[in-house]
């Protein structure tokens, strides 16, 4: 019984987003071609992506709408924001049409840059502003905002020239739209000297100079144009779009790394069996389980896991802890939340979200509230909770890796040793992960429940969508830290597992050879070999022949049991057997520590490069997670962590974090999942 192919939707969708991000060169803006969160993220993060405003598709309706507004305004029609005041002042009337629009922009340029205060970030990043300019432009293509085509062309030119205004970080309640942030885009278009524009990454000049440099002149706003520019959800939706691109990629990354965790922890793959999820058919649960089942299918580490649980199996837990065993059930609502949020944000991206909506075909202006960003605001809260859920799962799994009683044979703190009194492995990361998780859980608290009435009680409910999107972006940055730490730890665990296998072979070879040399009976030899395989190697690696550590204790106990059970065996007297066992112990002390130390030192020096010298890496070579291991160890040039190594954990985790933040991590992700949906290899930037 297997999974239905149709259930692979979210994996397919996310891989599609990654490919779209990589491949897009031009974003068509025409009011009919959908713009996705991947397109928005690509424009925000890649300077080679251009915007193409398609006149053939939308110019006629834009100009018809603009002409209708101008005609009605000149005729003295009573239309909100055209011949009336704004918000709570809509009872006021005026025929000073252009002055009214410029007055609106002037009063909304009320943000403050808090340079010198903590936190130091006091402005929205250029990525958010460029994305907002794109979404405002797209909103106008529906032909119901009343703005001139020339203003839209100017926005297109500014985007393609990489010119955008500096915008204060705070000040928007996202209803009536993102008024204050959007006023800075309007301020750039009208050439307000107080508005500072960025040109590229380094140049900052006043708005009039920025316009001049790209061959534009300041606009004198006509009726409704100022209101159309500021009265929308574009900033909240812009940030939400890049947030959703990242959330999708990180979701798939966490899901995939759950499989890698199963391998290194010696988890049982049974938790992903299709029948378990068929009888509880939540879509996200089925999809996550299907992915994990495929990732673990034919895993070479599962062979080691089955061997591990076959020894003293009645003394070992029958099932894995929740962080692995219930991961599909835990991920189920997170998958669904992120999927639904993506759909919602993309709906907002492809919408006209201002007021009033001009229905020129029926000769009317419809006064509504498409500027209300509650759909974005609420879903940003939901996504932040989902992100906290992903972080909690990582924290639980990471904790299992750090504790020797839970990690099925791995050393505490994932310390390579051998002297654990001076090697604390990844203990610092363990502490940091607790800090990250705590902050992430705090950020999961909702923003949208903290609404205050604004603007003279006219905006008595508002969405806080931009604030919520910003906080979700912040949460994602913490999740990236947690993923970087967890992936670093799992690569360390892979190294330790492979060293463990090599060391066990050394112990078995030495025990077998010495048993033969000392003339021990076959059943005695078998008992000793059983102990050599059963005792976790990291419990005695620091001093293999210490009589107080588990290996020698186990071997002695086995010998004692043999002597008690057998007074004679194959003609050997008990006294003779005791003498031979004593000789075995003496020779063991002479040989075992030296041979184990030689293997450990070689691995510590060369790590994954020992594959050139032996078959220590045979397990990871056959794993679907090899692309991640190679990427971290080879592409990022990290190494096995030990007390003798000069580098600190921070240096390695920083490299992994940077690769997540700039999107390089999607390279091994795509390679890892290549066979799941037949996706081609690729690369990506900007997670």
Swiss-Prot record:
Binding annotation for (E)-cinnamate: 231, 319, 325, 355, 427, 455, 458
Subunit annotation: Homodimer. Homotetramer, dimer of dimers.
Organism: Taxus chinensis
Pathway stated in the Swiss-Prot or TrEMBL entry: Alkaloid biosynthesis; taxol biosynthesis; Phenylpropanoid metabolism; trans-cinnamate biosynthesis; trans-cinnamate from L-phenylalanine: step 1/1
GO MF term set: intramolecular aminotransferase activity; phenylalanine ammonia-lyase activity
Industrial and biotechnological uses noted in the record: Could be used for the stereoselective biosynthesis of beta-amino acids via amination of cinnamic acid derivatives.
Subcellular location(s) per record: Cytoplasm
The name this protein goes by in its record: Phenylalanine aminomutase (L-beta-phenylalanine forming)
Entry function: Phenylalanine aminomutase that catalyzes the rearrangement of L-phenylalanine to R-beta-phenylalanine. Catalyzes the first committed step in the biosynthesis of the side chain of the alkaloid taxol (paclitaxel), a widely-used compound with antitumor activity. Also has low phenylalanine ammonia-lyase activity and can catalyze the amination of trans-cinnamate.
A biological process term (GO) from this entry: L-phenylalanine catabolic process
PTM characteristics: Contains an active site 4-methylidene-imidazol-5-one (MIO), which is formed autocatalytically by cyclization and dehydration of residues Ala-Ser-Gly.
């Amino acid at each position: 019984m297997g999974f239905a192919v149709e259930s692979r939707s979210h994996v397919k969708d996310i891989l599609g987003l990654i490919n779209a991000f990589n491949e897009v060169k031009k974003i068509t803006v025409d009011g009919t071609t959908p713009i996705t969160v991947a397109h928005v993220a690509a424009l925000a993060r890649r300077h080679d992506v251009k915007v193409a405003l398609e006149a053939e598709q939308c110019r006629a309706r834009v100009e018809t709408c603009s002409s209708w507004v101008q005609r009605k305004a000149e005729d003295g029609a009573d239309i909100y924001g055209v011949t009336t005041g704004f918000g709570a002042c809509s009872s006021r009337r005026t025929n000073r049409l252009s002055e009214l629009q410029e007055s609106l922009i002037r009063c909304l340029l009320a943000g403050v840059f808090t340079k010198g205060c903590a936190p130091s970030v006091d402005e929205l990043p250029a990525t958010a502003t460029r994305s907002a300019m794109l979404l405002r432009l797209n909103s106008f293509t529906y032909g119901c905002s009343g703005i001139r085509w020339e203003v839209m062309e100017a926005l297109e030119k500014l985007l393609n020239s990489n010119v955008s205004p500096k915008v204060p970080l705070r000040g928007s309640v996202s209803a009536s739209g993102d008024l204050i942030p959007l006023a800075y885009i309007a301020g750039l278009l009208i050439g307000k000297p107080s508005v500072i524009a960025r040109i590229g990454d380094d140049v900052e000049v006043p708005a009039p100079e920025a316009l001049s440099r790209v061959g534009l002149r300041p606009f004198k706003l006509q009726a409704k144009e100022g209101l159309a520019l500021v009265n929308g959800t574009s900033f909240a939706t812009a940030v939400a779009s890049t947030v959703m691109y990242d959330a999708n990629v990180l979701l798939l990354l966490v899901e995939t790394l759950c499989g890698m965790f199963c391998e290194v922890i010696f988890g049982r793959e049974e938790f992903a069996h299709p029948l378990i999820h068929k009888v509880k058919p939540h879509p996200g649960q089925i999809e996550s389980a299907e992915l994990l089942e495929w990732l673990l299918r034919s895993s070479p580490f599962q062979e080691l896991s089955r061997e591990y649980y076959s020894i003293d199996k009645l003394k070992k837990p029958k099932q894995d802890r929740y962080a692995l065993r219930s991961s599909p059930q835990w991920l189920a609502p997170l998958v669904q939340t992120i999927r639904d949020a993506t759909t919602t944000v993309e709906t907002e991206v492809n919408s006209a979200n201002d007021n009033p909506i001009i229905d020129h075909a029926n000769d009317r202006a419809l006064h509504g509230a498409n500027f209300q960003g509650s759909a974005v605001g609420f879903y940003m809260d939901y996504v932040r909770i989902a992100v906290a859920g992903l972080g909690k799962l990582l924290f639980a799994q990471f904790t299992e890796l750090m504790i020797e009683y839970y990690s099925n044979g791995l050393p505490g703190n994932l310390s390579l040793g051998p002297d654990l009194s001076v090697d604390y492995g990844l203990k610092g990361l363990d502490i940091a992960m607790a800090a990250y998780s705590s902050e992430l859980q705090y950020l999961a608290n909702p923003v949208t429940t903290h609404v205050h009435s604004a603007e003279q009680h006219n905006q008595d409910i508002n969405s806080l969508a931009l604030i919520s999107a910003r906080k979700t972006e912040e949460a994602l940055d913490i999740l990236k830290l947690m993923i970087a730490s967890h992936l670093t730890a799992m690569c360390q665990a892979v190294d330790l597992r492979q060293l463990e296998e090599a060391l066990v072979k050394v112990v078995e070879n030495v025990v077998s050879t010495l048993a033969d040399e000392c003339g021990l009976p076959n059943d005695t030899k078998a008992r000793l070999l059983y102990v050599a395989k059963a005792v976790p190697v990291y419990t005695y690696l620091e001093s293999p022949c210490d009589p107080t550590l588990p290996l020698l204790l186990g071997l002695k106990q086995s010998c004692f049991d043999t002597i008690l059970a057998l007074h004679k065996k194959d003609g050997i007297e008990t006294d003779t057997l005791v003498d031979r066992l004593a000789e075995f112990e003496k020779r063991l002390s002479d040989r075992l520590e030296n041979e184990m130390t030689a293997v450990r030192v070689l691995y510590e020096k060369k790590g994954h490069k020992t594959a050139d010298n032996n078959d220590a890496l045979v397990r990871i070579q056959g794993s679907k997670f090899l692309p991640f291991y190679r990427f971290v160890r080879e592409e990022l040039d990290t190494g096995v962590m030990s007390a003798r190594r000069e580098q600190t954990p921070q240096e390695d985790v920083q490299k992994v974090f940077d690769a997540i933040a700039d999107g390089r991590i999607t390279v091994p992700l795509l390679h890892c999942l290549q066979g799941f949906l037949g996706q081609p290899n690729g690369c990506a930037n900007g997670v």
